[in-house]
Amino acid sequence: MLKEVMHIGITVSDIEKSIKFYRDILGLTFKGQAVMEGKETDALFNMENCKIKIAYLNGSDNIIAPPIELLEFINHKTIEDKPQLNKISTSEICFKVNNIENVYKHLLNNNVECLSSPQEFDFTTYGFGKSKALYFKDPDGIILELMETF
């Protein structure tokens, strides 16, 4: 049946602005972009005259983690909604980091909105490990997470 997660799609309002954020601030590697349109695209997205810019960014060359797919709808207005962690949806995308304190400072230096400073958690009694985590937002307000495990 299912084999693996191929990519994680994020609908954005401005693909160039989002590419700069995910590439220049978060350090993902830009892999390329394309435009999707035509009858197959209309069918896949269940929209008429659908035209979408897509871009792929990756955090690893050997794709041990699924790439991020950015989508900007050209012919259809993007419906804005305020992302919330307690809303029934995909709540966040989590990125593993080696030094969360340094990455946190980097985000602040780049005027990225963070929901908190890094917080430490101990889930060893539940069979998991210890970690530090924080939530932050991309240019469209999409909630992302950083986690350092130890």
Predicted feature residues:
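Short, well-ordered beta-strand micro-motif
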Residues: 56-58, 72, 96, 135
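Short, structured motif recognition centered on aromatic/hydrophobic residues
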Residues: 65-68, 90, 144-146
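Acetyl-CoA-dependent GNAT
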Residues: 72-75, 149-150
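A short, acidic/glycine-rich surface segment
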Residues: 38-43, 76-81, 121-127
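Short, solvent-exposed beta-strand edge segments and adjacent coil->beta transition regions
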Residues: 3-7, 52, 88-92, 131
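Vicinal oxygen chelate
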Residues: 10, 33, 94-150
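Helix-adjacent hinge/juxtasegments
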Residues: 68-72, 83-85
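Core segments of cupin and vicinal oxygen chelate
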Residues: 11-64, 127-129
